[in-house]
């Protein structure tokens, strides 16, 4: 098969204000940053930036803990990192599920040797605090309560 001669040109859409659920407008500052050269995670400049980020996180959380760090990975990797460092075999963990990522938390808890005590809510609804209180009363030996603040699979926020 022979491809027809194509007139390849740059794609330059006209500027718009996006008002739907996504994608959303990106600020000029972010667009400029996205056009910057890519740094690898072992590049000295990247490591320097991560060290500065660590200092800022220590300030925000008012800690001098040397183990403070930002995770240079997707959110799921950060979640798994937390569980792997906090859960010991047999720990009870109250896990709230109202979307995909609550289920992923359950999987992580179980992979780390913990027992997931599930508090299930309808997908797309915030976590029901009364259910969490009931789970805490039924399982006072639970060492962790875990929930997804912004459940991106359903677009719901839980506080």
Language model regions located:
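N-terminal "arm"/small-domain region of PLP-dependent enzymes with the aminotransferase-like
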Residues: 1-43
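Active-site-proximal loop->helix
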Residues: 104-115, 122, 133-135
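Short beta->alpha connector loops at strand-helix junctions that form conserved
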Residues: 97, 119-122
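Conserved PLP-anchoring active-site segment centered on the Schiff-base-forming lysine
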Residues: 87-103
């Amino acid at each position: 098969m022979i491809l027809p001669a194509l007139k390849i040109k740059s794609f330059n859409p006209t500027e718009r204000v996006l008002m739907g659920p996504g994608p959303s407008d990106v600020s000029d500052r972010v667009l400029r940053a996205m056009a910057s050269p890519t740094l690898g995670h072992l590049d000295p400049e990247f490591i320097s930036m991560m060290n500065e980020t660590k200092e800022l996180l220590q300030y925000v959380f008012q800690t001098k803990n040397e183990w403070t760090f930002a995770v240079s990975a997707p959110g799921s990797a950060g979640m798994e990192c937390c569980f792997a460092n906090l859960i010991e075999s047999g720990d009870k963990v109250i896990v709230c599920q109202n979307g995909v990522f609550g289920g992923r938390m359950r999987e992580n808890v179980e992979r780390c040797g913990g027992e997931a005590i599930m508090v299930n809510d309808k997908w797309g609804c915030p976590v029901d605090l009364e259910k969490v209180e009931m789970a805490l009363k039924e399982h006072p030996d639970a060492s962790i309560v875990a929930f997804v603040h912004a459940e991106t699979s359903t677009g719901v926020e839980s506080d």
